[in-house]
Amino acid sequence: MSSGERLVHIDGLRGLAVLLMVMVHAAATWAPSSPSDATVLSLLVSGLGGLAAPLFVTLLGWGLIQRPRTWQERWRQATFLFACQFGVNLSAPHLFEPFTPGILSLMGLLVLTQPWWGRQWTPRPLYNMGILCVQLMFLLLLLDPFQTPSDWGARVSTPSLAVAGWHLLLTGTYPLIPWAFFAAFGATISCYQRHEVATDILLRLSLIGLVISFATLVYSVRAEVVWALPTGDAVLTFFPANIPFLVAACTGVALLWILASTTRAVDRFSELGRTSLSVYVVHFVPFVWLYQLDETYAWSASMSALTTLVYTLVWAIIGTLWYRHVRGWSLETLLRSWMKRPSDLPHPSNSEAE
């Protein structure tokens, strides 16, 4: 692959990731109040949300490893992403507090910490990822006394800068530890892709991941424990992201990557993918006025699901048209201007900001 060649399937994966994020946020916004109905919707949120965010972060790692960055570039890009996170928080007061760290602040922190999680300790990419996994497991054990409960409220409540710092590192919705795992996974894919063996590696990892995930499913059945939940008592939990979740999500991302790189299954989302940052940030804005509709009109589970689907499809169309007709007025374009090095930025090589 030449340095200036775009990979359509990377843009397609990015477009798919942002659509899944839109769907998950819409489902969380318009969740039915009935506990029995909410169980069905929670499976949707858990399943799709459990794959959307890891895919987003994996793509970030893939893009960041493409070329070296100066510290000035890192700070500029990270600052931009933190500012976008603040805008998202203001647009979704029903989900976040103004200074709650989220996935965009995680991405900003990953930009700054790439010399750690992206370090090439050995010539073998999988070994490098293994070294990071050992470091993450050690940090998780060391910092476990500081971990907060598996509860959404505790992870978005940010009454002070100190709490915000802990949320960024460990106790938030998308903390650096252990989410750096997915960035390192993306970097690993990128390294193997240069040698055209990425698909074989991903197939092997997928098989291992499927076996481990099936084993956790069998355990949950025998122990009569819920297999997967966003929060609470389950074998796989998203908040916090435990090891069984990391394995399952990594497996899902690997399978999606194989599908995208060997077929044209996600190519239709490629234009959307090139405005993914813009769509991610702006799709929260309507929630400022619409987030109480389900309570005001007592929506049923079916109505909530239909609204979620329509909202997601609308943003798929908006994102595609945005790229085709007004791409100059996007956060991606603004980021390139802010970085002040257009030749080194996202468009030539599917970089992470798109």
Language-model region placement:
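Alpha-helical transmembrane segments and their immediate juxtamembrane cytosolic regions
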Residues: 1-354
